[in-house]
Amino acid sequence: MIIEKKLDALGLTLFDVDRQYRANASGARFMSHLTVNNVLYLSGTTPVKDGAPHLTGVVGAELSIEQGYEAARYALLSSLAVVKYALGDLDRVQQAVQLIGFVNSAPGFAQQPRVINGATDLLVELYGDRGKPTRAAIGCQGLALNHSVEVVLTVLFSGDGVTPPLARDHYVK
């Protein structure tokens, strides 16, 4: 519960993963997470605040680098909500292994690493050296539902027991 106390101190709240997956505004079909041994692989997550998309738009046109940075923090917070759902306790994370960040970028925008620093910085704030992942920051022109940022997180965890993944296709009507 140490990590959750740090989140509280930062004024950050994890959302209800099951509720968010049932909403499935994008109609996407994928699993929330999968494990291989003690490695937890997450599907991409986007910025959510108060149950709604946060800071949507194109970075470098509609959004500033600073707004993109904040969006990346919230996208990582969405990842942490899935980690908590899967593992039951964020303290089970032993190492952030890899973070891949996609930035909905204006033509010619080349500051994706500065935007994705928002996600990396939050990992380090929470986990210290264990929060330093390998990383890629990729610019793209367009993300689902006009999200500004999407991150894909992989972590190494301790202990046994992982909640089965939520599958978005189960909720598509």
Where are the regions that the model predicts?
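N-terminal presequence-like segments and the immediate start of the first folded domain
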Residues: 1-77, 81, 85-97, 105-173
